[in-house]
Amino acid sequence: MSKFIEPSVEEIKLEKVYQDMGLSDQEYEKVCDILGRQPNFTETGIFSVMWSEHCSYKHSKPFLKQFPTSGEHVLMGPGEGAGVVDIGDNQAVVFKVESHNHPSAIEPYQGAATGVGGIIRDIVSIGARPINLLNSLRFGELDNKQNQRLLKGVVKGIGGYGNCIGIPTTAGEIEFDERYDGNPLVNAMCVGVINHDMIQKGTAKGVGNSVIYVGLKTGRDGIHGATFASEELTEESESKRPSVQIGDPFVGKKLMEATLEAITFDELVGIQDMGAAGLTSSSSEMAAKGGSGLHLRLEQVPTREPGISPYEMMLSETQERMLLVVEKGNEQKFLDLFDKHELDSAVIGEVTDTNRFVLTYDDEVYADIPVEPLADEAPVYILEGEEKDYNTSKNDYTHIDVKDTFFKLLKHPTIASKHYLYDQYDQQVGANTIIKPGLQASVVRVEGTNKAIASTIDGEARYVYNNPYEGGKMVVAEAYRNLIAVGATPLAMTDCLNYGSPEKKEIYQQLIDSTKGMAEACDILKTPVVSGNVSLYNETKGTSIFPTPVVGMVGLIENVNYLNDFEPQVGDKLYLIGDTKDDFGGSQLEKLIYGKVNHEFESLDLSSEVEKGESIKTAIREGLLSHVQTVGKGGLLITLAKLSAHYGLGLKSSIDITNAQLFSETQGRYVVSVKSGKTLNIDNAIEIGLLTDSDNFKVTTPYTEISENVSDIKQIWEGAIAQCLTTQD
């Protein structure tokens, strides 16, 4: 008789306990078919988390198959803890992005902190030392006190974990829209570097080899966290606060260093982070990859308190834990290492040849499941989408007040400087950061070399809602341009797909179309997808977020010497590369004036992106350019203002465009500053101005003139978010 009081198999079926765990009637019946019997309480819980949307991608797997995943530089693609890409000299870059949206909505500090901790462990589990962190965040508008609280908590959580563990946060992006009220998006990315011969895989093989648990003792925090992340947020979600994990960055630091030492041991067979679904996913996935079985003796698992049941142990998402498989007879070597780092560890099982996932506690069997169906045979749902009949009529922008529009956009939190927030992050711990958070991608030197890794993270929402297919192309191209802007060669990307409920036809269609656009852009821009994450059911009280695919992209700089004087100077000439058209669908101007997305859209020419990108990258590396800025949110006038304010330089510009086109967000444009005495030879580059040593920012068109003090612009741009967060109702 079990020492733990749990529902019987009959109660699970009759009272439909499995539904509370997230399994549908059909999924429960499939579990019964796989087992040839009704599952017990622990087995039901295990299937529920492994077949959750968060772990199985059961609604998104068909779309993910569209993405190109191989390429010249790819060493390891999707399927492991993170992607691995060659950077030459027997070195590789390891990177991935993950979401922690639902936990951050309920407990913003811990939700964000554990999101950072989890993505760090994904990188470390491959054997790489992390070199930088990035994040992509979405919140509701800041005139709402709840959104202010969420923003403050998330930023504090990101900084609190990253700063303590000693990894710089070097880049990110934050946008604000009422569609994220109560449902923030917190996507964390980590980048690491490794030598080829140290790359690890999450595999369990070799009959008789031992399974070692290391890290924090298992508690009851985070139970069913993967299931919680696969549901819509409702008024009852607050009661699921225990589903939010608790992070400990100081233990995280110890675990990181111990793991990086453990990978140097030849006796290590495989290693995986205990992330979503905790011990269940890490152990069963390792067994599946190794084509093996596992027997875990759960009484050996280090626990925080007595009485924790097998069900709770297997579903707990206690943070700062790793699972290792080591060669039999060499266990003590690893246990001694972990003891040296003051970490709890234990041998909790062994690899078998049964192809079954067996869990016992004091010799009583609590689960006996075939490995392959559990890990690889979750149901895949192909639903029906519904093409929306978009209104594509043109809005009227002919009578806008340029000055008023300029200042309203400049101080909107989406466009305003994020330094007030980023200053809470340690940006240079480790002393290898070359370009910090600001106007373009971050650049971090590869220690001991003259190489550097450029990284960026970018998301699109209004554009994707505007036209999912074109928006999907745009988000990949935006990341590509940001790497080009620092002279890097884009190598590969990771993605996080943040959407509402796929069971709604319109949202399912958004997934179909946007991933098709992303895949096309990846193919043409030669940026294969090597890792990623899907976060669905981002809805609050029945209202979906905007479809928000996020792309993290890395690039290689073979020699950083050209960055020594890569900063705009007085006397540099400004050029605009790329045509400016009447493109306002999904823009900040459209939001400011009309509020709703009108669905007028442009078609992105990906081939021209490559041509412009190569020309600009060459000009940077030849030392012709002192700065490159992509034209983004708010359009050309806002881009020029940010350039002027960020560097404290005067600017004088004359541009032959209309008033509205000052705020057009036509894709594929760059503003470049050419060093004094240098000549730029790029097709269709138009000289538009000069950087000066005055405090004057002056932009003239045939129809208007803006003339303001740079210091005033800087004060408004840099102070806007702080003002929003300190304003009382």
From Swiss-Prot:
GO molecular function terms noted in the UniProt entry: ATP binding; magnesium ion binding; phosphoribosylformylglycinamidine synthase activity
Highest taxon above the source species: Bacteria
Pathway(s) served: Purine metabolism; IMP biosynthesis via de novo pathway; 5-amino-1-(5-phospho-D-ribosyl)imidazole from N(2)-formyl-N(1)-(5-phospho-D-ribosyl)glycinamide: step 1/2
Reaction catalysis annotation: N(2)-formyl-N(1)-(5-phospho-beta-D-ribosyl)glycinamide + L-glutamine + ATP + H2O = 2-formamido-N(1)-(5-O-phospho-beta-D-ribosyl)acetamidine + L-glutamate + ADP + phosphate + H(+)
Top-tier EC class: ligase
Gene Ontology biological-process annotations: 'de novo' IMP biosynthetic process
Keyword field contains Methyltransferase: no
Active site, per annotation: H54, H100
Gene Ontology cellular component annotations, sorted alphabetically: cytoplasm
Residues the entry annotates as binding substrate: S99, H100, N101, H102, R121, Q245, E317, T318, Q319, S535
InterPro entries in the record: PRibForGlyAmidine_synth_PurL, PurL_linker, PurM-like_C_dom, PurM-like_C_sf, PurM-like_N, PurM-like_N_sf
Subcellular localization: Cytoplasm
Amino-acid positions noted as binding ATP in the UniProt annotation, renumbered to this chain: Y57, K96, D495, G532
Chief subcellular location: cytoplasm
Residues the record lists as binding Mg(2+) 1: E98, N533
EC number: 6.3.5.3
Ranges annotated as spanning the membrane: none
Role description: Part of the phosphoribosylformylglycinamidine synthase complex involved in the purines biosynthetic pathway. Catalyzes the ATP-dependent conversion of formylglycinamide ribonucleotide (FGAR) and glutamine to yield formylglycinamidine ribonucleotide (FGAM) and glutamate. The FGAM synthase complex is composed of three subunits. PurQ produces an ammonia molecule by converting glutamine to glutamate. PurL transfers the ammonia molecule to FGAR to form FGAM in an ATP-dependent manner.
UniProt subunit comment: Monomer. Part of the FGAM synthase complex composed of 1 PurL, 1 PurQ and 2 PurS subunits.
Homology family: Belongs to the FGAMS family.
Protein's UniProt name: Phosphoribosylformylglycinamidine synthase subunit PurL
Species name: Staphylococcus aureus (strain JH9)
